[in-house]
Each structure stands twice: as C-alpha cells, then as structure tokens.
Amino acid sequence: YGNTGGYTPVPDIDDIHVVEIANYAVTEYNKKSGVVAGVNYRFVLK
C-alpha cells in the first residue's frame, strides 16, 4: 500500500478531513513558530 518511506499526493485536497488536518497542522505550527533572530518563518501548503 502506498510508497513505503515516501510521500504520495493527497487525492482530494478539498476533502473536509484533509482541510481539517491542514488547518490543525498550520495552527499548531503557528503556535510554535515566531520571530527567531529577526526572521519570520512561514509554513506553506499547496
């Protein structure tokens, strides 16, 4: 099943569960990120 040890594209990025997981990931990432040595980091989902 799938690609062992690799990444595979999400078949439907508009699926409500995918959107919920992505929103959760971004929210958690934003809680842990911030300004470090004057640099802002951004998490991008395409």
Curated annotation (Swiss-Prot):
Keywords: Protease inhibitor, Thiol protease inhibitor. GO terms for molecular function: cysteine-type endopeptidase inhibitor activity. A motif (Secondary area of contact) lies at residues 35-38. The keyword tRNA processing does not apply. Gene3D superfamilies: 3.10.450.10. Signal peptide: none annotated. Inhibitor of papain. This is Cystatin WCPI-3. It comes from Wisteria floribunda (Japanese wisteria).
